[in-house]
Amino acid sequence: MNPAQILLTNDDGIQSPGLWTAASALSDLGFVNVVAPRDQFSGAGRSLPIYSDGLIDQQKMEVDGRDWNVYAVGGTPAQAVLHAIFEILPEKPILTVAGINYGENLGTGVTVSGTVGAALESATHGIPALAISLETKREYHLSYSPEVDFSTAGFFAAYFGRKLLEKTLPSDVCVLKVDVPCEATPDTPWEITRLSRKIYYHPTPPDRDSWDQPGIPSYEVVGDPLQD
C-alpha cells in the first residue's frame, strides 16, 4: 500500500529551517512532498499574482542524513499549493501542512499571512490543512536565523497532523491554525481559542522623504499574544 501523500509548503521559502523541521517531523505520517516558494513570500496572504513566473525547480536536499526531492516554485505560497496539486504530486494529497513559520500569526492581520493563505488555498480544494507558526522575536521574522529552535513546533506539527489524518474537521472549519509559544515544550498543554479582533501587527508608513525614493509600509508588534 502506498504511503499517504502529504503536501508541505510555507511562505518563508524553500531554504527555511522551519520548513525542514516540519518535513522531518511529518515523515512518519506519510510521504512528505515539499513544494514551497523559491523566494521569501511572507505577507503574501492567499494572493495569486499574474506576474509570478511559475517556474518549478526540482532540487535534491539532504536534511538529517536523508535525501529529499523538493520543488522550488516561482510563486506565492497559494500558487505553490496549486502547482503541487495540478502538476507535481502523483495524486491529490490527503493533508496539507503550511509552516513552520518564523513568527506568530495573530489578530486581525492573520489573513496577510502566506502560511495561512496556503492552508486556505488547500482547503478550497477539499484538502484538510494545518497552518503552524512559532512565536519568535521580531528580528527573526524574515530571517533564516539558526537561533530559533523549531523542535517543539515540529512536535506539534506532527501531533496535529496526525489528528487531522485520524479525524475530519467539523463541516464549518476549513483550516486548523496552530501558534506555538516560544517557551513551549512538547508537554505544554494546548487549547482551542479564537482570534482576537485587535491589531497585533501595526502597519507603519514607509521610511522615506519623497515618493521617488523606494519604500514600503512595514509593521511593529503592538499586541499581546495572550490578549483577548
Can you name each region flagged by the protein language model?
Residues 2-6, 20-87, 91-92:
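A cross-family phosphate/adenosyl-ligand binding-site feature
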Residues 84-90, 117-128:
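Alpha-helix C-terminal capping segments
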